[in-house]
Amino acid sequence: ESPVTFASQQQSISAENCHSNIRIATINLFNFIEPPLAFYDFENIYSHGQWQKKCQWFGELLNQYHPDIVGFQEVFSPEPLKQLATQQGLTHFAIVDSATLVSDYIYQSPVVALASRFPILEVHAIEPDAHLVAAMGLSSQFTFSRKVLRATVDIPQIGACDCYVVHFKSKRPGLALEPHPLGLTLSAPPTLALHSETKLLTEQALGRWASTMQRGAEAALLFHAILARRQSIRYPVILMGDFNDSLSMGALDALTLQGEHLHSNDIKAAGLGHLSDIARLAVFAQYRLQDAYELFIAANMPDNLVHSREHRAATHYYGPKGSVLDYILLSNEFDASDSRSLAQVVDYQTCDRHLVRPEYERDAYSTDHAPVWVELSLRR
C-alpha cells in the first residue's frame, strides 16, 4: 500500500525512511467523545458502530504515519484516546484540562492533548500574564478559550523539547444582542428596534470581530509565554494545533514575529542599536518560530517556492473554499539554514484524502480537518 494513502497528493520529496527521524503530527479529532456521552446537544451521540469506525480511522492514520509526537484537539474523552495512542506505541500522554459537563451526559468545551513515543518530562498549562492582559486593555477575566498545553518531551539525540498544543478561538461569532439594551434609563434616548435581518448582520459583524480579537490576543500572549520560557530555558520549541486562522492573517502575526520586522527606532529604544546586523539577527533568531511547511520547501524545493506556496493543500474546507488552519511551527533548531540547527524538515504531508475524495463507508466519522504530519531528520 502506498505510504501516502491519507494524503490526496504527494507534496513532498520523500526522505529515506530513517528510524532515527522524528515525526510530528497535529490532529483535530472532531468531537472525539465516547458513547453514551453527547457533544453539545442530547442528539449528538455516536452509536457503538459509529464510534468504532471513528476510532478505527484514527488508529489507521497513526499506524500509517507512525508519528512520534502528536498534538490532538477536540478531545472530550481522553481515556479512549490514551488507549488508542498506546496501541500505536505512543505510551506517554498529557492533558491539562477536561471538557465541561453541561447537563446529564451532554458536554461542551473539548480540550487538547499530547501523546508521545518518548518520555514526557513535565506538563504545564499556559496561563496568560495578568500584567500583559491589563496592558492590552483586556478584561481581567481574559483567558485562553481552550487551555494551552506545554509538554516537555525527551527526544532522542535532541534532548528536552517544549511541545505546545493549541486550539485557538474559532471564527464562529458567539455574540447575541440583548433584546433591550442593558442599563437603559428612562432619560436615555429611545433605541431603534432592529429588524431580524439587521440584528443578525450586526451580531455576525461584531461576533466575528470579537472572535478575531480573542484569537489575536491568545496568539500574542502565548508568544510571550514561549519567549519567556526560551529566555530562561533554551529548549527547542514545537508549536502545533488548530489555529482557526491563516498564519498570514493579522490576528496570528505575533507567532511568527521576526527581528527583521522591527523598526530601527524600536531596536534602538530597546538598547540593541549597538549590535551589528548579523549579531542582531542571531539574537532574534533564537526566538523565531517558523511554519514547518515553509522550512520544508526552503530546504527541499528552493527553486519552486512560489508554486509550492500557491499549491499548498488546505486543511479545512468551508463549502468549496479551502484554508490552511492547522500548523506545526518550529524554532530555529529545526531550520536547515541555521548553522546551529539540530534537525531539518525533510517531509511534510497534509492528510486530506477524506476531505477532497471522501468515501462514506471509510470516512463518515473521521474529521473535518486534515491532519498535518512532518518528518525531521537529525543533522549528521
List the model feature ranges, each with a label.
Residues 1-112, 195-199, 219-220, 234, ...:
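N-terminal, active-site-proximal structural segment of metallo-dependent hydrolase catalytic domains
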Residues 2-12, 125, 133, 137-144, ...:
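Metal-dependent phosphoester-hydrolase catalytic domains
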Residues 16-24, 145-200:
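Beta-strand-turn-beta hairpins that frame and shape the catalytic cleft
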Residues 30, 75-76, 169, 243-246:
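Catalytic metal-binding/acid-base residues of hydrolase active sites
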Residues 34-52, 174-212:
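A solvent-exposed, charged loop/short amphipathic helix patch at secondary-structure junctions
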Residues 44-48, 67-72, 205-213, 239, ...:
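Second-shell loop/turn segments in exported
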Residues 71, 75-176:
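Structured beta-strand-rich core segments of catalytic domains in phosphoester-bond hydrolases
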Residues 90-101, 184-190, 261-264:
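Acidic, His- and aromatic-enriched active-site or binding-groove loops in soluble protein domains
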